[in-house]
Amino acid sequence: LGLRGVSKNARQAQIDEVLSRTGLQRFARTPARVLSFGEQQKLALARAWALNPQVLFLDEPTASLDPAGTRAVEQIIAAIQSGGTKIIMTTHDLGQARRLGDEILFLHQGKLIEKTEAQSFFERPASNLGQAFLNGDLLW
């Protein structure tokens, strides 16, 4: 925020607001190096959100997190979405795609196979590859 010319007082207000919206107030003065991996993931999302992006790209944002950490990160992602930021996320987690996705772009071997609403993809995939993936028959 400082690089964007935001004053110190405005920066602090914006940081406090984002920490509050993400439930991370207790980490306001904690050095990132002492946080767990899951806490670092949550803080990284909060930092990105503080910039008020129109689009946020997330690559496997919950990889290597335990279920509680995954749930917490997904809650922050949902809050960011509800604030109007478009999220583009890669995931191999079908449950996560179902919970967070409104549109699915299904790729296989670098090629776009399907682009559709999430509900349509999970209920009626338009391709045999999409169906095989949902059935667990397509591993890579």
For each of these PLM feature ranges, what is it?
Residues 56-59:
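Catalytic Walker B motif of ABC-type/P-loop ATPase nucleotide-binding domains
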Residues 31-35:
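Conserved ABC ATPase signature
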Residues 97-99:
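A short, surface-exposed alpha-helical micro-motif characterized by mixed small hydrophobic
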Residues 52:
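Conserved catalytic motifs of ABC-family nucleotide-binding domains
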Residues 2, 9-27:
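Conserved ABC ATPase "signature" region
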Residues 91-92:
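H-loop/switch region of ABC-family ATPase nucleotide-binding domains
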